[in-house]
Amino acid sequence: MEQTEEHTDTHTDEQDEAVDRNDRKERIGVVESAKMDKTITVSVRRQMKHPMYGKYLERSSTFMAHDEGDEANEGDTVRIMETRPISKNKRWRLVEIIERAK
C-alpha cells in the first residue's frame, strides 16, 4: 500500500502577494514639475563616494509619478512608491506629501 504524505503548507498566495507589495521601492524627493494632468516629476538626490578619490558627490535621478488627485505642487517634498507601469514613462505613484513648499 502506498502512503501519501499530506502537504501542510501554512503559507498562502495572499501572504505572498502582501509580502511582495511591502517590498516595493520607495524614494523621497522634491517635486520639480506639476504641470501635467495627474503626473508629477520628482527629483531624488543621493550622495555617492567617488571610488578613487573618496570625495562625496551629489547625484540626482528624475522620476515621473502618478498623482491621482493633483495634490502635489512644485517644491513639495514627497514619498513615491514603485508600482505597475501606468504609462510609457510612469512607474511610480505618490504615497504622501511629507512637507509643503513654503
UniProtKB/Swiss-Prot annotation:
InterPro entries attached to this UniProt entry: NA-bd_OB-fold (IPR012340), Ribosomal_uS17 (IPR000266), Ribosomal_uS17_bact/chlr (IPR019984), Ribosomal_uS17_CS (IPR019979)
PROSITE patterns, alphabetized: RIBOSOMAL_S17
Gene Ontology BP annotations: translation
Swiss-Prot/TrEMBL keywords: Ribonucleoprotein, Ribosomal protein, RNA-binding, rRNA-binding
Example GO molecular function: structural constituent of ribosome
Region (Disordered): 1-27
Cellular component per GO, a single term: cytosolic small ribosomal subunit
Coiled-coil features, chain-numbered ranges: none
Family: Belongs to the universal ribosomal protein uS17 family.
Subunit structure: Part of the 30S ribosomal subunit.
Role of this protein: One of the primary rRNA binding proteins, it binds specifically to the 5'-end of 16S ribosomal RNA.
HAMAP family the record matches: Ribosomal_uS17_B (MF_01345_B)
Protein name in UniProt: Small ribosomal subunit protein uS17
Organism of origin: Salinibacter ruber (strain DSM 13855 / M31)
